[in-house]
Amino acid sequence: MARIAGINIPDQKHTVIALTGIFGIGRTRARAICAATSIAEDAKIKELSEAQIDILREAVAEYTVEGDLRREVSMNIKRLMDLGCYRGIRHRRSLPLRGQRTKTNARTRKGPRKPIRK
């Protein structure tokens, strides 16, 4: 298994699919990386040489991925909560942020129903 950005990439998968195992790299970005490094998208990881894997490592290192990206996202959410803006308040209350109705739906975000006390 090749190790890129601290993640073990599966050998038996195609390059594009294997790169999507890294948090922060989807299909589009994986294709862009393959095009920039001139590595075939349908080549399996085990078929690549060490030099090609090193080139992939350098290309992935140009993007914010894995722990840095997770930290950045959580810091953005924390910033919204500290500001006390509408989105921050909705995050704090674990409610939907983008205008969805909450009278009848939003069970995933709100959690299981709480029984009514009399």
Curated annotation (Swiss-Prot):
InterPro entries in alphabetical order: Rbsml_uS13_C, Ribosomal_uS13, Ribosomal_uS13-like_H2TH, Ribosomal_uS13_bac-type, Ribosomal_uS13_CS
Gene: rpsM
Start and end residues of each stretch annotated as Disordered: 94-118
Protein name per the record: Small ribosomal subunit protein uS13
Protein family according to the UniProt entry: Belongs to the universal ribosomal protein uS13 family.
Gene Ontology CC: cytosol; small ribosomal subunit
Positions of transmembrane segments: none
Physiological role: Located at the top of the head of the 30S subunit, it contacts several helices of the 16S rRNA. In the 70S ribosome it contacts the 23S rRNA (bridge B1a) and protein L5 of the 50S subunit (bridge B1b), connecting the 2 subunits; these bridges are implicated in subunit movement. Contacts the tRNAs in the A and P-sites.
Pfam families, per database record: Ribosomal_S13 (PF00416)
Subunit structure: Part of the 30S ribosomal subunit. Forms a loose heterodimer with protein S19. Forms two bridges to the 50S subunit in the 70S ribosome.
Domain of life assignment: Bacteria
GO BP annotations listed: translation
Gene Ontology MF annotations: rRNA binding; structural constituent of ribosome; tRNA binding
Keywords, alphabetical: Ribonucleoprotein, Ribosomal protein, RNA-binding, rRNA-binding, tRNA-binding
